[in-house]
Amino acid sequence: MAKKIQSYIKLQVAAGMANPSPPIGPALGQKGVNIMEFCKLFNKTTENVEKGLPIPVIVTVYSDRSFTFITKTPPASVLLKKAAGIKSGSSKPKIETTGKITKLQIEEIAKTKKNDMTGLNIESMMRSIEGTAKSMGLIVED
């Protein structure tokens, strides 16, 4: 018989840097999950990812306090900031620009995110990521 799911916990954790401090500790502790076990498994899973990159993770907690988790790709905004070499997006996107990004870089980001963006082809994903770039004040060049 399958285990009964108690709850889902959505977190964003820096790759390779999971530790029991907030927000991880309290979120998992409330559900009775072994926090250190999660931290060790998460850090091992994300050891091939650039350290410090925020990784969305969905933790499934079962009624017997066991858990499984799924890691996603970093948010598009983080990948765009990294590709453009900027610290943050513009506070006034239509008025101020923060940097430039090429279509080739957007295509690379789309290919990175293809597993998380279901039901879309590469062109659709590129348009979506272009929209995110524009809302951050980035200029998209050909």
Curated annotation (Swiss-Prot):
Q: Which Gene Ontology cellular component annotation is one that this UniProt entry carries?
A: cytosolic large ribosomal subunit
Cite the Pfam families for this sequence: Ribosomal_L11 (PF00298), Ribosomal_L11_N (PF03946)
Describe the processing and modification events after translation: One or more lysine residues are methylated.
Keyword RNA-binding belongs to the record: yes
Q: Which UniProt keywords apply?
A: Methylation, Ribonucleoprotein, Ribosomal protein, RNA-binding, rRNA-binding
Q: Which Gene3D superfamilies match?
A: Ribosomal protein L11, C-terminal domain, Ribosomal protein L11/L12, N-terminal domain
Q: Which GO terms are recorded in the biological process aspect for this UniProt protein?
A: translation
**Organism's domain of life?**
Bacteria
| KW rRNA-binding (keyword) present | yes
SMART domains registered for this protein in UniProt: RL11
What InterPro entries does this protein's entry cite?
A: Ribosomal_uL11 (IPR000911), Ribosomal_uL11_bac-typ (IPR006519), Ribosomal_uL11_C (IPR020783), Ribosomal_uL11_C_sf (IPR036769), Ribosomal_uL11_CS (IPR020785), Ribosomal_uL11_N (IPR020784), Ribosomal_uL11_N_sf (IPR036796)
State the Gene Ontology terms under molecular function: large ribosomal subunit rRNA binding; structural constituent of ribosome
> Which CDD domains does the record match to this protein?
Ribosomal_L11
SUPFAM superfamilies, per database record: Ribosomal L11/L12e N-terminal domain, Ribosomal protein L11, C-terminal domain
The record's comment on protein family reads: Belongs to the universal ribosomal protein uL11 family.
Q: How does it assemble?
A: Part of the ribosomal stalk of the 50S ribosomal subunit. Interacts with L10 and the large rRNA to form the base of the stalk. L10 forms an elongated spine to which L12 dimers bind in a sequential fashion forming a multimeric L10(L12)X complex.
Role of this protein? Forms part of the ribosomal stalk which helps the ribosome interact with GTP-bound translation factors.
Q: What is the name attached to this protein's record?
A: Large ribosomal subunit protein uL11
